């Protein structure tokens, strides 16, 4: 797909995968409407990119349905069209399910699943009016397999994956591409700032960068792939554990052992970097 002069809405667009995706779309010539809760971070990334393309921001909680309606009104006012929606905003409060706060569980579902459903519903007529485009969801390997300690998050990402496949079938023959990227652990604050609470199993899978995921997002906009897992080994792992859960439970201790080694190394590297930064 040629992105020049297309209008792209990116939720969670102020940092991490969202910011990396915004940078790549900007280089490709797309106009950007970046969405996040924090206005200061939005302003910072917008200022960074305005020498490359036109960028507008909209500070909002994606789980606010009324604000979502206003988001598309702003898109109409500023750009007169919407071509691409990237549902990237995510929320994850790690805790054993039986100890998780009820409001945290609700927020997880609201941000990770209900918001993309509402935003997608609002985006479709705009994208059709623009002549076609894409809706790409940022999922997770957690939506493809069992991840104890992240039950609500995994459920929300499984729902997002189901939304992707069901809607793609419903819109078959239309000019809107529906896709999802399912990465494993990503080297961003979403995981690394809470690394001690992240289950060992997560780190048994290859670590991605925000730029890795962003490139897949752009690729999915224009190819015929419905879902891109990152990486091939993770696709095999999640498929096997989903189809054969008893085998998955048997293999899990081996993967957790591997994950503990990786996690220990990452924590050590992080502490070393912090010491070096302090020394300067």
Show where each model-derived region lies:
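The beta1-alpha1 cofactor-binding region of Rossmann-like NAD(H)/NADP(H)-dependent oxidoreductases
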Residues: 40, 58-70, 102
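Residue(s) in the substrate-gating loop at a strand-loop-helix junction
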Residues: 140
């Amino acid at each position: 797909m040629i992105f020049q002069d297309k209008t792209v809405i990116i939720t969670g667009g102020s940092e991490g995968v969202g910011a990396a995706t915004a940078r790549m779309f900007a280089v490709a010539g797309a106009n950007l409407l970046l969405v996040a809760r924090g206005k200061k971070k939005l302003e910072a990334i917008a200022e960074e990119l305005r020498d490359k393309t036109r960028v507008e921001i909209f500070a909002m909680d994606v789980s606010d349905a009324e604000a979502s309606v206003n988001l598309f009104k702003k898109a109409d006012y500023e750009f007169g069209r919407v071509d691409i929606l990237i549902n990237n905003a995510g929320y994850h409060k790690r805790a054993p399910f039986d100890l998780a706060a009820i409001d945290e569980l609700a927020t997880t579902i609201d941000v990770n699943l209900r918001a993309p459903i509402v935003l997608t519903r609002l985006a479709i007529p705009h994208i059709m009016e623009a002549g076609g485009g894409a809706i790409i969801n940022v999922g997770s390997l957690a939506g493809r397999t069992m991840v104890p300690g992240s039950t609500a998050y995994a459920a929300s990402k499984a729902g997002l994956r189901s939304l992707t496949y069901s809607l793609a079938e419903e819109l078959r023959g239309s000019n809107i591409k529906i896709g999802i990227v399912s990465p494993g652990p990503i080297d961003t604050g979403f995981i690394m700032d809470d690394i001690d609470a992240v289950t060992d199993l997560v780190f048994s899978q290859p670590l991605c960068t925000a730029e890795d995921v962003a490139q897949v997002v752009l690729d999915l906009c224009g190819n015929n792939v419905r879902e891109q897992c990152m990486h091939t080994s993770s696709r095999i792992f999640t498929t096997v554990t989903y189809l054969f859960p008893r085998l998955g439970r048997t293999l899990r201790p081996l993967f957790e052992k591997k994950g503990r080694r990786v996690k220990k190394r990452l924590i050590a590297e992080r502490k070393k970097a912090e010491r070096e930064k302090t020394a300067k």
